[in-house]
Structures are given as structure tokens and as C-alpha cells.
């Protein structure tokens, strides 16, 4: 993977998101409330750029929240860290529409690879953690999958984690 070292944002002012693709739909409003609170708290403490991997589930939800706070959080930006071109090709019609609207309104879109490869999601997660000073997570404690990997990587690098699970 070709690493992108030059970005428009500063690591010290950036937070990344990680979370499960699937969650209990009956808890959607509670999850949104917790994510919103974590985003506002981060913003209050100097985080102005939010990096999302734009996967189905928590990533898209968090990106939507960041965009909804545009008027109440001056200077906040949304960065899309896309693991490979065509990420949304297999999304449902609704998720694809949400994805495309968010991509169109994102402040920066980084396509990390032109095509899918086995580690592309993990490499995207590493990119986000390595370019953030805070990780906002929706992590249930299971020791498998991309959310676990990202959570573990942030801890290894000494990056603070706010888990809204």
C-alpha cells in the first residue's frame, strides 16, 4: 500500500473512529447520543478533524454526526479514509446513498489504494490511528476483527481511547 504522509490535517487535532459494522438497531439512538457526546467533548478539547473509514455501521453513523455538527462546531472537518476505490460497490442502496452524500460533503477524501487487497481494511485502520491523537470507539470487547485490531493498535501507540459502547 502506498502510504499517504501528506494530509491537510494535523495529528494533534484529529480523532479517528472505529466501531462494529453491525449493532443492535434498537440501540441506534443511544449509540448516536453517545457518539455525539464524545465528538463534542473531543471538539471542546481541541480536536477539529474527525477521520472516518466510511464502513457500514458506526463509521457512517459517526461521519453523519460530524457533518450534522458543522454549524455548531466552527472549523471542524471530516476526513474520509477510504481503504480502496469502490469500497461502497457492494453496499445496500440506502448505505451507498448515505456514503456518497458523505463523500461529497467531506472536507478531505483519501483513497488509500486503487483496488481491494487482503489487508486493505487493516491498513486503513492503521492509517487512521497513526494520524490521530484520539480514538473514539464503539467496541464490545470481542478479541477479533477490525475494531479489536484498531483498539489494540491505539493502546499500543499510547493513543487515548474513548469507548462509547
Which residues does each PLM region occupy?
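Acidic/glycine-enriched connector segments
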Residues: 2-165
Amino acid at each position: 500500500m502506498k502510504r499517504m504522509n501528506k494530509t491537510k490535517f494535523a495529528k494533534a487535532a484529529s480523532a479517528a473512529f472505529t466501531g462494529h459494522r453491525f449493532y443492535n438497531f434498537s440501540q441506534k439512538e443511544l449509540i448516536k447520543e453517545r457518539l455525539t457526546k464524545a465528538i463534542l467533548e473531543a471538539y471542546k478539547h481541541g480536536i477539529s478533524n474527525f477521520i472516518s473509514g466510511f464502513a457500514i455501521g458506526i463509521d457512517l453513523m459517526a461521519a453523519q454526526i460530524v457533518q450534522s455538527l458543522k454549524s455548531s462546531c466552527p472549523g471542524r472537518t471530516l476526513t474520509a479514509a477510504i481503504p480502496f476505490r469502490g469500497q461502497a460497490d457492494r453496499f445496500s442502496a440506502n448505505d451507498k446513498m448515505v456514503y456518497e452524500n458523505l463523500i461529497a460533503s467531506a472536507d478531505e477524501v483519501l483513497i488509500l489504494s486503487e483496488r481491494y487487497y487482503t489487508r486493505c481494511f487493516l491498513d486503513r485502520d492503521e492509517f487512521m490511528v497513526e494520524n490521530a491523537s484520539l480514538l473514539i470507539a464503539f467496541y464490545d470487547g470481542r478479541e477479533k476483527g477490525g475494531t479489536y485490531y484498531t483498539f489494540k493498535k491505539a493502546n499500543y501507540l499510547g493513543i487515548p481511547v474513548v469507548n462509547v459502547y
